[in-house]
A protein has these predicted regions:
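N-terminal redox-cofactor-binding region of secreted/periplasmic oxidoreductases
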Residues: 1-105
């Protein structure tokens, strides 16, 4: 918690050339590249990627649907699915969906 508070205090100090919302794979890379010659603020609503199951490929089974690392979104019911709604896992952690997908492409 102290690290998060420290990060928030640093974020509130000054102006930024770029603000990137979402620290998934693309957001992290974009912030890194933009900050080479400018200032960039990277915002992420989720927490640290310190959950053991995000480090093990088979761990995606324990990540998807887990409110600690997944937003828990569902699709709208679809007629072609007999009115069912499907789970739509989205990463709520640094690294985004790449942290919870078990390295599956």
């Amino acid at each position: 918690m102290a690290d998060e508070t420290k990060s928030m205090e640093a974020a509130n100090m000054g102006a930024y050339d770029y603000i990137i919302v979402g620290a998934g794979s693309a957001g992290g890379v974009l912030a890194n590249r933009l900050s080479e010659n400018a200032t960039a603020l990277l915002l992420e609503a989720g927490g640290k990627d310190d959950y053991i199951w995000t480090k093990i490929p088979v761990g995606y089974l324990f990540c998807m649907g887990n409110p600690r690392v997944d937003w828990g979104f569902k699709t709208e019911p679809e007629a072609g699915l007999n009115g069912r709604a499907l789970d739509y896992p989205r990463g709520k952690v640094l690294g985004g969906c790449s942290s919870i997908n078990g390295m599956i492409y």
